[in-house]
UniProtKB/Swiss-Prot annotation:
Keyword Electron transport annotated: no
Gene: HOX15
Residue numbers spanned by region Disordered: 1-44, 221-247
Keyword Phosphoprotein attached: no
Protein name: Homeobox-leucine zipper protein HOX15
Organism annotation: Oryza sativa subsp. japonica (Rice)
Family in the record: Belongs to the HD-ZIP homeobox family. Class II subfamily.
Tissue and organ expression note: Expressed in seedlings, stems, leaf blades and panicles.
UniProt cross-references to CDD domains, sorted A to Z: homeodomain
Keywords associated with the record: DNA-binding, Homeobox, Nucleus, Transcription, Transcription regulation
Length: 247
């Protein structure tokens, strides 16, 4: 069995030659082993007397050439696509130069409709001699600028409202502090006035008032006098510092 393997290797080297053997080695290093094995066919012809002969087909070299061409085409396509993308990016980054008539027409259309459907976009692009994509980008930028301006106006209005409310809050806080201080002082004075006792020595009955009350009771009718006698009379209190006119 070992002798047969050596014969197979010797026959392979003789059939390919030095150049073919080198080419096969390079192809085996680059191509997968499964693909190379599938392209190699071993045949045992009957007339050879049982001696194995290896026939290497040209599909190996042809497959390598096709694979190389495919890789080259793919690399070429990738480079061309990248260059096209770069050109498109450069063109898109260029600022659109519009004439006064074009700008005026775009502004009028924007005032009528802030957004355009595809048909309106194409018609306006033809009228302005522009591409539909350029018209779409202009409308997008115009909407963004309008929204930014409205946001700035709203921010300024809210800022003023915030300042007004802050000042009103401070004023109300000062008024609240003043009311609290006034309420505290009033409550303290009322508490002092109600809690201080009145000395009993300062209260006395005026003698003249008592005499007048007795004379009025004597000159009244008996029933009225009886009613007065039945009802207790409240004592008249006066201050010793205030003298009566009768006294």
């Amino acid at each position: 069995m070992a002798q047969d393997d050596e014969d197979v290797g010797l026959a392979l080297g003789l059939s390919l030659g030095s150049g073919g053997h080198r080419r096969q080695r390079e192809s085996r290093d680059e191509a997968p082993s499964s693909a190379a094995a599938s392209l190699l066919t071993l045949r045992l012809p009957a007339e050879s007397g049982g001696q194995p002969q290896v026939v290497v087909k040209r599909e190996v070299v042809r497959a390598e050439e096709e694979e190389y061409e495919y890789e080259y085409e793919r690399a070429l396509y990738s480079s061309s696509a990248a260059a096209a993308d770069d050109d498109e990016g450069c063109n898109s980054r260029k600022k659109l130069r519009l004439s006064k008539e074009q700008s005026a027409l775009l502004e009028d259309r924007f005032k009528e409709h802030s957004t355009l459907n595809p048909k309106q976009k194409v018609a306006l692009a033809k009228q302005l001699n522009l591409r539909p994509r350029q018209v779409e980008v202009w409308f997008q930028n115009r909407r963004a600028r309008t929204k930014l301006k409205q946001t700035e106006v709203d921010c300024e209005l809210l800022k003023r409202c915030c300042e007004t409310l802050t000042e009103e809050n401070r004023r109300l806080h000062r008024e609240l502090q003043q009311l609290r201080a006034l309420t505290h002082s009033t409550a303290a004075g009322f508490f002092m006035a109600t809690t201080l006792p009145v000395p009993a020595a300062t209260l006395s009955i005026c003698p003249s008032c008592e005499r007048l009350a007795t004379a009025a009771a004597a000159g009244a009718s008996p029933t009225a006098a009886a009613d007065r006698t039945n009802k207790p009379t409240a004592p008249h209190l006066f201050s010793p510092f205030a003298k009566s006119a009768a006294c």
